[in-house]
Amino acid sequence: HQVGIQGGVELSTRTLEQNLRLLARAPLLSAPGERFNYSLAIDVLGAVLERVTGMPLPQLFVEWVARPLGLGNTAFYAADAANLATPYYNTPQGPQRMHEGLRLALPEEMAGGEVLFSPARALNAGAYPSGGAGMVGDADDVLRLVEALRSGGQDMLRPDTVALLHSPHVGAQAQTQGPGWGFGFGGALLVDADAAQTPQQAGTLTWGGVYGHSWFFDPQAQLSVVILTNTAFEGMCGRYPQQIRDAVYAAEMG
């Protein structure tokens, strides 16, 4: 942000190409592979897809993902504000309603830094399509997507690509979920359940979003779980998703 780069959850005043030109000129935070940090890498991949296919990213999403999976309520912006949940954020005094330009510090265990929020971006059809953080949807659609990944990609992905989702690619510096976790191409990957002190089994893939959602799928247990809240950051990395996780496994174990 010090060089004016914009992310997928803040007010967008540039095109994707303009934003990535700024990114290309920004100095590296560290040498590649030295440490984990958030980036616009997935936005870059979205731009690569546009160049390779000659199609805009929203059209790619519809043709490659939404239509095959039957996702009817997920897009890069919401056409109707009435369909959006009101976003809140945690404070010591209880949840407070978000406002434009709100800055929140990320938890230290998530590499620190801060998030600049723009709830109005979800209604801005002119905002650039952010592959990393720029979409809205509902629980049914997210669950369909997560379940498709758990079951092997449902013909959207090649078997070797699916295998990359389930392989750790970064060392201990990327243990954003704590000990026992690695990082695959799809998010945090559980490597050692005992070290992580979780009922989930090795191979579980999980991630979340700063507005307050979390998801995971456990291939061994044949479980896909989606937790959507409207509260940052509790719904992403607070006690609530941990309690839901534990309740799900307690019910499964009977």
Predicted regions and their residues:
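Short, surface-exposed loop or secondary-structure junction motifs
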Residues: H1-P199
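Extracellular/periplasmic catalytic domains that process cell-envelope and extracellular macromolecules
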Residues: S30, F217-P219
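Solvent-exposed loop/turn segments at secondary-structure junctions
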Residues: I42-D43, T231-F233
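Short, surface-exposed charged micro-motifs
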Residues: G186, S214-F216
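Short, hydrophobic/aromatic-rich segments at coil-to-beta transitions
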Residues: P199-L205
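Short, small/polar residue-rich loop motifs at catalytic or cofactor-binding pockets
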Residues: G209-Y211
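Short, well-ordered beta-strand elements
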Residues: W215, Q222-T231
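Generic C-terminus detector
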Residues: A232-G254
